[in-house]
Amino acid sequence: LGAVHGIASVIGGMYPAPHGEVCASLLTAVMRANISALMSRTPESRVIQRYERIAHLVTGNSKASFSDGIEWFIKLCQDLEIPRLKRLGVKKDEFPQIVISSKLSSSIKSNPIELTDSELLEILETAY
């Protein structure tokens, strides 16, 4: 389930925000953070190739990069009017607690790479 669900479950426990909307609002920020962390810490990871394969599938372009895939998902979220965390009522001053609690969630343990506190905070900032 990974970081999307790990963070979303914490937010859902703190705010009356629909789980699916929280997950969707976090998706592209988590994708970016995962790819960045993988490229810098484990560039040989096959997960990077999986992100590229997803980009090929969603864009219909066999030469699409993982960045193209992320842009496709960003556009989809805009088209579907997925709310940002701010619109879902999440308070920025609670980001540190969300990070701490997210690291304890069982879902985050299945993320393809362990994310640092600063990476988790950046996800929240990006999705805000």
Q: What is each of the regions a protein language model found here?
A:
Residues L1, I7, E44, K75, ...:
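Homeobox/homeodomain signature
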Residues L1, K63, I82, I108-N111:
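Intrinsically disordered or highly flexible coil/loop and linker segments, enriched in small
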Residues L1-C23, S105-K109:
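Glycine-rich phosphate/pyrophosphate-binding beta-alpha loops
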Residues G6-S9, S25-L26, D68, Q97, ...:
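Amphipathic alpha-helical interaction segments
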Residues S9, T28-R32, H56, I100, ...:
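Generic alpha-helical structural context detector
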Residues M14-E94:
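Gly/Pro-rich interdomain helix-loop hinge
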Residues K91-Y128:
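Short, amphipathic C-terminal "tail helix"
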